[in-house]
Amino acid sequence: MENYQDYECQEVKSIHELYFETVARHAEEVAFEYSAGVVTYSELNERVLHAAGRMVPYQGKQVFIGVLDPLKFAIAYFSCVLSGCVAVLGAPDDYDVFQKSGGNAQLCITDSNVFDGSAGKVPLGAYSVSDTDAVCTILHSSGTEGAPKWVMLSHANICSNIVSGLRKYLMRQVDVFYNIIPYYHAFGLVCDFLAPLFVGAKICVPDKKELFFSQMAIFCPTALNVPPAVAMRLSHYISVAGSAAAVTGGRLKKILCGGAGLAAEISKRLREQGINALGCYGLSECSPCVSVNRDEFYKDGSAGIPLGCNDVSIGGDGEVLIRGTNVMKGYYGDEAETCRILSGGVLHTGDLGRIDGDGFLFITGRKKNVIVFDDGTKCSPEIYEAQIVAHTDAEEALIRIGNGQPMRLEALIYATDNSKQDEIRRYITDLDINKRISSVLFTNTPLPKNSLGKVQRNYEKR
């Protein structure tokens, strides 16, 4: 398998340019589809411009957007940015968090008060962007070291990431996407919202998130952007149903997994089921994508090859370092942390990784998760967790320091088949860190995760 020429993608420098190009080229195409009906790009534009008229008094100010519905989010986000406001994105209950952390949002928009209707329509192109390096979006992020942060992104950050991403990973106007990721997450905002709309694709929305799988065959998506945990569940449902078409509607050809690492075993299993599951790597601080596996140039278990908008290198201690036009402007209200993470224009991700001879990036762990034993040896638990999941019937694995036993580890395993516990124990016995593991615990329920499928390593033990 060899790399190939980039896909073509028009250059855009600002959200304004992206939006106006989109509605001009795809006016009569369907932008959003619900079970109750569809909304075309021209209809979306009418709603956005009316809403933008209501946003004019807030020009230059912060506006918090805690909207979950995709169409309402589109109206709120585009009207906010087009009007020259700074969109602050988060879950609905993050508004107070932002304000208490030094935020100065003058307006809070939720699903119940999105501006829509006939008031105050703004003419197309009434506002332009004089400085594409100006901050247009602030995202709530866990931060590279786990502490919640507010990431400031500019027009140039976001647009360079979209364009570079579309040159490596194919999205087409004929594609049908199916939403489950909140758009207040960077992966959702860029990969599942802005990029699909930029190419004129259709975004379908289930009646409820809980109906995502049961309604999938109704909408017949061609592509998904989901966390690995969702990809794993999809593979399971396909196995139970006996065919991918019975679950997906028969048109799903590929999945892009972000937010957490995609295990090689899951990619292989889905490919055997007729779906190309590809992993990528990113951080909110990088707008968010850093690397991606291409449609016809990929390595299972890898994070893909770097996008053209950034340079990726590995530091002396194995840390992944990034420099590029997609790297954030900084953390809002935290100059000290910004200076610590961004040194000389280089983002210190806190992730450990390596780049192979073909240019593929592999993420091997987190610096903060490395366990240092009393004899000076070190362990990256993510490496062993991935091995356990890949080579046994364990659905999920978590290795961490055990209670009351300094420098002794415990392995917590989620496995749905209790009869496989002895087999999993035997595999763990053969690992080179087995002598460090004092206990292997099993659970019949999935390990707690955040909304993008990352296991919460420090949750309270049950």
Please give the residue ranges for each predicted region.
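AMP-binding/adenylate-forming catalytic core of the ANL superfamily
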Residues: 324, 330, 352-435
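Conserved AMP-binding/adenylate-forming
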Residues: 37-38, 52-93, 180
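Conserved pre-ATP/AMP-binding loop-to-beta segment of ANL
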Residues: 10-13, 27-28, 122-140, 147, ...
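Conserved AMP-binding A3 loop
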Residues: 40-41, 136-160
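Conserved AMP-binding/adenylation subdomain of ANL enzymes
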Residues: 159-176, 183-243
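Conserved AMP-binding/adenylate-forming core of the ANL superfamily
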Residues: 9-11, 15, 28-57, 70, ...
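Gly/Ser/Thr-rich phosphate-binding loop
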Residues: 222-226, 235-298
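Conserved ATP/PPi-binding loop(s) of AMP-dependent carboxylate-activating enzymes
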Residues: 302-308, 315-341, 360, 375-379
